[in-house]
């Protein structure tokens, strides 16, 4: 998916009915009526970093019908006087450990006559370490459109993303006779471990 940089991009997602997936999530609002919203935001963002990375868009309502639950319906702007970009950044940095490098928060004004009504876009890179939600002391990972607690092996797998074997393969193609086919002996003169 291309980076979302304008209201036109948002409208294109809605018009095309681009469904949520592992790398895209819609949130209709940021409910700050209780303190649970901080833990929920930390869970959503850390889960996406622990999976493949992706984008969370705050300010898009999905359809209520079960069969269309993950499809965007319409824009539901977030009021910046209630939740600012700085507040979101603070919640993320103080509730996820370690901090997610390369995370970006952007803000799109929905209607220029109402500058306090915005959509927040959080672009989350795939991480090379596991991120913990400090509110729950758990590690989460996004699977398609759901978020689950991670198993021990999944946490270890994420922490080893930067470790790759150094393998070089050399091939030689040549035409062989039928008789040579039965006598092929592999050579390993360039095998490095």
What kind of feature is each model-predicted range?
Residues 1-24, 28-54, 61-65, 154-193:
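Bergerat-fold GHKL/Histidine-kinase-like ATPase
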Residues 24, 28, 73, 132, ...:
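Flexible, active-site-adjacent loop/turn segments at secondary-structure boundaries
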Residues 32, 77-80, 136, 141:
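Generic structural "secondary-structure junction" signal
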Residues 35, 63-115:
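A broadly used, surface-exposed interaction patch
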Residues 50-53, 93, 97, 127:
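Non-catalytic alpha-helical coupling and interface elements of nucleotide-dependent molecular machines
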Residues 57-59, 121:
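A structural signal for short, well-ordered beta-strand segments and their strand-loop junctions
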Residues 99-184:
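Mixed-charge intrinsically disordered linker/loop segments at interdomain junctions
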């Amino acid at each position: 998916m291309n980076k979302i940089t304008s209201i036109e991009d948002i409208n294109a997602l809605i018009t095309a009915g681009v469904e949520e997936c592992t790398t895209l999530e819609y949130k209709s609002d940021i409910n700050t009526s209780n303190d649970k919203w901080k833990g929920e935001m930390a869970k959503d963002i850390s889960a996406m970093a622990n999976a493949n990375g992706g984008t969370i868009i705050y300010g898009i309502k999905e359809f209520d019908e079960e069969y269309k639950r993950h499809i965007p319906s319409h824009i539901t702007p977030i009021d910046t006087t209630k939740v600012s970009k700085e507040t979101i950044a603070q919640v993320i940095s103080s509730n996820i450990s370690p901090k997610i490098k390369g995370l970006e928060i952007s803000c799109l004004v929905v209607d220029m006559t109402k500058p306090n009504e915005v959509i927040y876009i959080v672009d989350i890179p795939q991480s090379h370490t596991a991120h913990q939600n400090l509110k729950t002391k758990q590690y989460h990972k996004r699977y398609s459109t759901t978020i689950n607690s991670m198993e021990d092996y999944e946490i270890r797998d994420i922490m080893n993303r930067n470790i790759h074997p150094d393998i070089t393969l050399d091939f030689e193609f040549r035409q062989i006779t039928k008789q040579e086919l039965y006598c092929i002996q592999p050579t390993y003169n360039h095998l490095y471990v």
